[in-house]
């Protein structure tokens, strides 16, 4: 199918120009496409990108949360910068070539398996790529990221990446700054994940959920060098730096505050948290030196203490305060945190050396020999303070003294040892010429005078020093040239170069005065790192070698020995000050030296015999020799170099002029240029300690191993000279292997170890992904195929429907010739069958048939239509739309056959009179159902969270918390008080017990039910009566409230007892309830029409049994007929015709209906029985047993009554005896009945309790005997009734007299109901031709469906006659028993209640025998009654009445206004107000007719005295 069709089926939205403009309007954008730079198209259901050609100026396009499967349609969007395509169905990155300016691309939550087509050649400025939640899984899917040179933000979270080789890809992304990998398996598989990625990505500033701080990177680099110990140390350095920053900021604030306060009120500055006392400074400094492998403080002293007289004096005071409160380790950490230009490189020293040499050379050229001698001495003195500090694993300090002669050398060596340099750091004393030279005391200042007086050596000294000056100047230049190329020359010239630099540094150091020595290392370090240091400035202005002694410029150039002496004294004073400071720093060196020795032995393999000396100075020298890897070689080279220099001096010093000396020095310096370059490289390596520590390069990696970025941060030096030939000489470090190399080996080993596993897992995952993708493709294809077929079906149906409409409109005549189309009749939904107006009529057809007589259901219509489509398309086509082609005519005929069988049976069963009575019954049924529901709910109101109250005669819910009134919730279908014909649960069928048993399917014909119930009743009743009598012997005092409920008017009693409006389950009980109601309707119809002698042959009996047993399966197949069913229908039709004949004779025997009040019979003060009027008789038509309510004068228990109802779990008939104020039902407690005249208690008989089998037999689903027995049973019942009357006369003293109550009612209401029912029948008849063929209609017209009005009149006459007979008999019994009989007749309306008038009176409802000829009972039943009467005379009548009523309940009374006879006891009769009573004497004549209804068998005269209000 084409793409367009598929879009229509899936319901996705097309991206049209009109729709785009509407979206622009909605988002308040421009209607002119080219004016918009942003377009919001998200959450629109688009499947493809199209029609964007006019939006040429778009810079931002939002397309997330659509159904886009391909990137396309962007050819004109050349200015697009941001494209958002997350939450779509994209599988490949493509078609982005036109968007050359694309900066941000979001492809999250798609189906992408490989990153491609986004390289710099396609998207040259792509900066951000978000591709989270896709199907990326290995390094191959990410390999194209290497081509994204400008990509700086990459989000790969929540993919399936598990390949650790992706680190190699990230290493090649030089601009990657933000990386998100969380949610991938590789995060847990990559060892030291965060450190590894920080080291791999040099520019990374953000990793996953947090930034990459400089501290993180420094710690990662330290971990790479020295492992976890190095990381810990680096972390501690950063912590100290942070603390020092905080402390310095606080101290700065304190100093500013103190500047405005008098001295006595100033606050002290904060001390270091590491040292609370100045006495701990030495210890802290040594710990720092041991940790960091350096002595930075000495380096700072040497390199920084050169302040000018102008600037140094102004800052000394504040700097002293700072220095006093800061420990040396904090100063070091401060340098760590401020990584700028490398302070440690000896740039200033080199420049100072060159400046001093230039000054010396200039002085040599401009002054006479005596002045030269003085300058040389000064230069020699200045060389005494040269100190070289180098940071290695073993810290070392080389303090080398190079005097002009032996005495000078000895004095300087003594000075070095007295100043205590060796107490802080390793001090190497380089022995020159004479190793056995004695050490002289520092105090002997006279030695300096001897140096001056020895003029015979000055010329040679000058020659040597002038040559050295040129050598050092050339060495400094070479040093700067060799620093960047990171290469070594040979190790042969280290001694001479170090000696020269030490002389220079020492000269500058001892020139400092006392005030300048106290300045902090920070300030002076910054000053010395400046490109234009104070030394050079001072030299330019004053042309002085020593800038701190500008005031002595003139005197120095003078040949006066006094100035020279003063200068030497000042130098000695400065040395003393430095010695004192160094001793202060190194007070606690002994313990630290032991630690230093131990750490040194671990790094450099040493022989223990080298540190065997016990002398302090000798131990220190030996320790320095062990710690310094260059020391032995330096010593030897130093000696060689010095020897060579002295030989040159001796050979050139004698007899040369100043000019010749300059020429000689210049020539020889040219010859030694190459060697000096080697010295410069050695010196560069010797001074590399500070940069290594500051930048974390490590103690085992020298400057030539530095990373490029660290090299770029060093001081800018001059041109680079490459000497690759000599590189290998010092390539390797002294130690065996660095931690960096070890880490590399470990990484390589791990990579090799995991390579195979990675490859295998990658292959497995790749196969699984391919399989999943293949399955996805198959499923997608199948979906499209299904939608394609459905589309074709819809199109075909649509076209056919159009053709049908045209054909039905224009060619209506053709319908009769060929059944191409069918008349559907009115199409109604399943909920529209019932009438909505009164009166209510029973349904013509059971719901199982979907009421085809009134209109087909939608399902039937659709089936018919499908068949029509089949015949229209191709009559010969065997299959169309998956259905077998059938003609609609066949289905119509099948429906007609159904109507002929069961539907017509029900029509015959219901006459107009029965329908009219049913209307009245349903009205009363509704009233009683509502009353019973409300009363039971009210009685159980305590069970609910909210209470139920009666408000204005309406049951309302009272909220417990707020007290608000609310209507009751709508009841479920089981409790619905609507009179819909679909709702027939008022007469449900239940079995005894707990109500959990549900009956099977509905019987097909009501006659089967009735016959079966009679057969089972015959077998069980005798046993039941005996069981009841035996139980009464032991439970005479028990009372069971059997006050009649309306005839199955509502649900069974157990349901109402369990009713909880909050937990109504209408699905469980509604279906069986409806089925029971249908059964009841059939039974009722049969009782009205078929109560006479129906003799059926064997064939009919068999047919009924078969039909009944298969009714369950027929309900779901109402449209399918078979020959067996047709036979059944034919037999049933015959039975119906015969039934009509019996019905005509039956109506002749029926009595005239009268609406009578309740009749109560009493003997003395005891109420015998009470018969409810009207609805009681109506609703007893289908009762399986009657419930007799007897009075217990001893005990009344409402709970027992309820228990009885639950045990029977069957519909109870209620006598609705009400007053205007109160409603009585079986939940209302009955008070104890007392005979106020005699004071005696009346014996109460328990009602019979029927077993479950007996009750179930009333609704049995099968036939167990031939239906001919029914006739015999009915005849026996009639005979026993006559015998019963004669037996009562034989026992007059034990029989209770009856008081008859008779009231004639108007027939107006009955006639109105009858007219309404007939009107409905007329409507039904009018529509029958739509469904039935003419033949069937003609047959129906021949049948009689109702009786005439004349027949109704005869019925009324018969009823009156029957009542007369009963009254006459009752009067005779009354006269025979006692003269104390009080015959009281009270006429009440439906709501009157005798218990209100007579306080504690108890009454019981008893169903009246109003049709003796229609009430058969078994001989066994009546014989059992007579046997019990002999055994227990006091209980005989109640038992007999119970059995008779039980038998009577199996038959249906005439559906007209009924008669009620009630017996009762009236102990409070004498207490009633006579004003409200009226007594009349009534005489009646009764005629007993024969079975045919036309012969008078007997005439009786009845006299009664009636009292009423």
From Swiss-Prot:
Ranges of compositional bias, category Polar residues: 1103-1112
Disordered: region residues: 252-280, 306-327, 962-1008, 1103-1122
Keyword flag Repeat: yes
Primary localisation category: other
InterPro entries: Cilia_flagella_integrity, Leu-rich_rpt, Leu-rich_rpt_4, LRR_dom_sf
GO biological process: axoneme assembly; chemical synaptic transmission; cilium assembly
SMART domains to which the protein is assigned, alphabetical: LRR_SD22
Compartment(s): Cell projection, Cilium
Gene3D superfamilies registered for this protein in UniProt: Ribonuclease Inhibitor
UniProt feature, compositional bias: Low complexity: 309-318
GO molecular function: dynein complex binding
Domain LRRCT: residue ranges: 185-223
Family matches, as Pfam families: LRR_4, LRR_9
Protein family membership: Belongs to the DNAAF1 family.
Record-given protein name: Dynein axonemal assembly factor 1 homolog
Originating species: Drosophila yakuba (Fruit fly)
Gene assigned in the entry: dtr
């Amino acid at each position: 199918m084409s793409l367009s069709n598929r879009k229509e089926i899936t319901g996705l939205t097309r991206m049209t120009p009109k729709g785009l403009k509407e979206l622009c309007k909605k988002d308040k954008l421009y209607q002119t496409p080219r004016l918009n730079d942003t377009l919001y198209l998200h959450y629109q259901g688009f499947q493809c990108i199209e029609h964007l050609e006019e939006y040429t100026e778009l810079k931002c396009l939002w397309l997330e949360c659509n159904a886009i499967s391909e990137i396309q349609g962007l050819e004109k969007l050349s200015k697009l910068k941001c494209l958002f395509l997350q939450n779509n169905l994209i599988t490949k990155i493509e078609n982005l070539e036109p968007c050359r300016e694309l900066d941000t691309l979001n492809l999250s939550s798609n189906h992408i398996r490989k990153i491609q087509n986004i390289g710099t050649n396609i998207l040259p400025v792509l900066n951000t790529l978000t591709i989270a939640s896709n199907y990326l899984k290995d390094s191959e899917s990410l390999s194209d990221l290497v081509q994204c040179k400008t990509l700086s933000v990459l989000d790969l979270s929540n993919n399936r990446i598990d390949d650790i080789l992706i680190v190699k890809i990230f290493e090649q992304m030089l601009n990657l700054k933000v990386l998100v990998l969380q949610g991938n398996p590789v995060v847990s598989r990559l060892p030291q994940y965060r450190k590894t990625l920080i080291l791999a990505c040099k520019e990374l500033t953000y990793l996953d959920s947090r930034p990459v701080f400089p501290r993180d990177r420094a710690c990662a680099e330290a971990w790479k060098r020295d492992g976890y110990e190095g990381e810990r140390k680096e972390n501690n350095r950063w912590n100290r730096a942070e603390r020092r920053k905080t402390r310095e900021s606080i101290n700065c604030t304190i100093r500013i505050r103190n500047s405005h306060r008098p001295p006595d009120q100033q606050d002290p500055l904060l001390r270091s948290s590491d040292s609370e006392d100045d006495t701990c400074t030495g210890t802290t400094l040594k710990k720092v030196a041991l940790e960091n492998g350096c002595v930075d403080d000495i380096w700072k002293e040497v390199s920084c203490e050169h302040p000018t007289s102008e600037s140094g004096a102004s800052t000394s005071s504040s700097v002293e305060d700072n220095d006093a409160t800061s420990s040396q380790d904090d100063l070091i950490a401060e340098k760590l945190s401020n990584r700028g230009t490398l302070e440690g490189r000896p740039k200033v020293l080199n420049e100072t050396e060159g400046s001093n040499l230039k000054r010396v050379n200039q002085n040599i050229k401009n002054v006479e020999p005596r002045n030269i001698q003085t300058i040389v001495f000064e230069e020699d003195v200045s060389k005494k303070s040269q100190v070289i500090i180098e940071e290695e694993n073993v810290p070392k300090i080389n303090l080398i003294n190079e005097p002009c002669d032996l005495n000078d050398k000895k004095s300087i060596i003594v000075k070095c040892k007295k100043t205590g340099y060796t107490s802080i750091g390793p001090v190497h004393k380089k022995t020159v010429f004479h190793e056995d030279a004695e050490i002289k005391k520092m105090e002997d200042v006279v030695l300096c005078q001897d140096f001056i007086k020895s003029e015979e050596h000055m010329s040679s000294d000058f020659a040597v020093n002038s040559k050295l000056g040129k050598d050092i100047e050339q060495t400094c230049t070479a040093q700067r040239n060799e620093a960047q190329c990171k290469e070594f020359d040979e190790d042969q010239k280290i001694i001479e170069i170090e000696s020269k630099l030490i002389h220079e540094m020492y000269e500058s150091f001892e020139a400092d005065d006392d005030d300048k020595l106290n300045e902090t290392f920070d300030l002076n370090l910054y000053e010395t790192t400046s490109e234009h240091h104070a030394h050079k400035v001072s030299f330019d202005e004053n042309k002085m070698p020593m800038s701190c002694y500008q005031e002595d410029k003139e005197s120095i150039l003078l040949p006066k020995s006094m100035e020279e002496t003063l200068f030497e004294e000042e130098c000695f004073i400065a040395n003393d000050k430095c010695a004192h400071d160094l001793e202060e720093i190194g007070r606690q060196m002994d313990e630290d030296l032991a630690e230093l020795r131990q750490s040194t032995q671990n790094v450099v393999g040493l022989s223990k015999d080298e540190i065997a000396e016990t002398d302090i100075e000798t131990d220190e020298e030996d320790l320095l020799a062990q710690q310094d890897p260059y020391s032995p070689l330096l010593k030897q080279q130093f000696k060689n170099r010095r020897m060579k220099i002295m030989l040159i001096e001796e050979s050139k010093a004698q007899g040369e002029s100043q000019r010749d000396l300059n020429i000689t020095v210049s020539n020889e310096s040219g010859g030694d240029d190459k060697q000096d370059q080697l010295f410069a490289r050695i010196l560069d390596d010797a001074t590399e300690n500070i940069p290594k520590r500051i930048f974390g390069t490590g103690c085992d990696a020298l400057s030539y191993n530095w990373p490029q970025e660290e090299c770029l941060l060093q001081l800018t030096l001059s041109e680079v000279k490459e000497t690759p030939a000599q590189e290998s000489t010092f390539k390797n470090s002294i130690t065996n292997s660095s931690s960096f190399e070890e880490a590399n080996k470990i990484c390589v080993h791990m990579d090799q170890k995991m390579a195979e596993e990675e490859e295998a897992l990658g292959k497995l995952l790749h196969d699984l992904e391919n399989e999943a993708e293949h399955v996805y493709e198959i499923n997608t294809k199948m979906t499209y195929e299904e939608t394609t077929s459905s589309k074709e079906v819809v199109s075909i149906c649509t076209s056919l429907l159009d053709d049908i409409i045209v054909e039905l409109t224009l060619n209506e005549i053709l319908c009769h010739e060929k059944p191409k189309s069918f008349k559907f009749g009115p199409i109604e939904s399943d909920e529209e069958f019932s009438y909505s107006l009164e009166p209510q009529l029973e349904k013509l057809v059971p719901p199982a048939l979907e009421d085809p007589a009134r209109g087909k259901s939608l399902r039937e219509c659709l089936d018919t239509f499908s068949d029509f489509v089949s015949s229209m398309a191709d009559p010969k086509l065997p299959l169309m739309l998956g259905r077998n082609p059938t003609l609609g005519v066949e289905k119509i005929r099948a429906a007609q056959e159904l109507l002929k069988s069961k539907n017509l049976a029900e029509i015959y069963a219901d006459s107009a009179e029965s329908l009219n009575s049913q209307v009245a019954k349903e009205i009363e049924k509704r009233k009683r159902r509502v009353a019973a529901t409300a009363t039971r709910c009210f009685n159980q109101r305590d069970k609910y969270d909210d209470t139920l109250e009666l408000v204005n005669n309406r049951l309302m819910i009272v909220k417990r918390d707020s007290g608000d009134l609310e209507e009751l919730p709508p009841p479920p279908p089981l409790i619905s008080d609507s009179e819909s014909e679909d709702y027939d649960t008022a007469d449900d069928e239940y079995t005894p017990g707990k109500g959990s048993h549900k009956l099977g399917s509905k019987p097909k014909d009501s006659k089967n039910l009735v016959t079966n119930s009679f057969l089972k009743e015959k077998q069980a009743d005798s046993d039941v009566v005996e069981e009841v009598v035996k139980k009464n012997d032991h439970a005479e005092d028990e009372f069971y409230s059997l006050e009649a409920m309306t005839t199955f008017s509502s649900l069974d009693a157990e349901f109402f007892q369990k009713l909880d409006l909050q937990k109504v389950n209408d699905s469980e009980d509604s279906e069986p309830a409806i089925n029971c109601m249908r059964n009841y309707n059939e039974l009722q119809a049969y009782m009205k029409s078929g109560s006479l002698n129906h003799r059926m042959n064997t064939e009919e009996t068999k047919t009924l049994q078969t039909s009944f047993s298969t009714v369950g399966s027929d309900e779901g197949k109402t449209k399918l007929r078979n020959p067996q069913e047709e036979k059944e229908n034919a037999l049933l039709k015959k039975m119906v015709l015969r039934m009509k004949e019996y019905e005509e004779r039956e109506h002749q025997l029926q009595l005239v209906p009268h609406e009578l009040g309740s009749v109560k019979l009493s003997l003395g003060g005891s109420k015998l029985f009470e018969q409810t009027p009207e609805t009681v008789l109506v609703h007893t038509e289908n009762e399986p047993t009657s419930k007799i309510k007897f009075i217990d004068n001893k005990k009344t228990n409402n709970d027992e009554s309820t228990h009885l109802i639950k045990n029977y779990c069957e519909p109870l008939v209620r006598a609705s005896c009400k007053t205007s104020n109160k409603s009585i039902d079986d939940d209302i407690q009955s008070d104890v009945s007392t005979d106020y005249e005699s004071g005696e208690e009346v014996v109460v008989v328990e009602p019979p309790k029927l077993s479950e089998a007996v009750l179930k037999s009333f609704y049995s689903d099968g036939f167990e005997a031939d239906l001919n027995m029914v006739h015999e049973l009915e005849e026996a019942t009639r005979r026993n009734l006559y015998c019963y009357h004669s037996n009562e006369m034989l026992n007059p003293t034990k029989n209770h007299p009856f008081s008859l109550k008779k009231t004639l009612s108007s027939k107006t209401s009955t006639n109105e109901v009858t007219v309404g029912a007939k009107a409905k029948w007329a409507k039904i008849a009018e529509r029958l031709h739509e469904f039935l063929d003419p033949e069937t209609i003609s047959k129906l017209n021949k049948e009689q469906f109702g009786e005439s009005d004349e027949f109704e009149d005869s019925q009324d006459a018969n009823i009156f006659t029957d009542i007369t007979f009963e009254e006459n008999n009752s009067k005779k019994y009354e006269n025979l028993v006692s003269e104390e009989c009080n015959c009281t007749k009270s006429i009440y309306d439906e709501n009157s209640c005798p218990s209100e008038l007579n306080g504690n009176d108890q009454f019981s409802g008893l169903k009246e025998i109003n049709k003796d000829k229609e009430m058969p009972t078994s001989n066994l039943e009546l014989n059992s009654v007579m046997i019990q009467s002999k055994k227990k005379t006091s209980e005989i009548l109640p038992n007999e009445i119970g059995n008779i009523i039980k038998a009577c309940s199996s038959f249906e009374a005439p559906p007209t206004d009924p008669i009620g006879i009630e017996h009762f006891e009236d102990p409070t009769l004498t207490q009633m107000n006579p004003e409200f009573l009226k007594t009349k004497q009534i005489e009646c004549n009764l005629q007993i007719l024969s079975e045919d209804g036309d012969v008078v068998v007997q005439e009786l005269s009845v006299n009664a005295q009636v009292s009423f209000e």
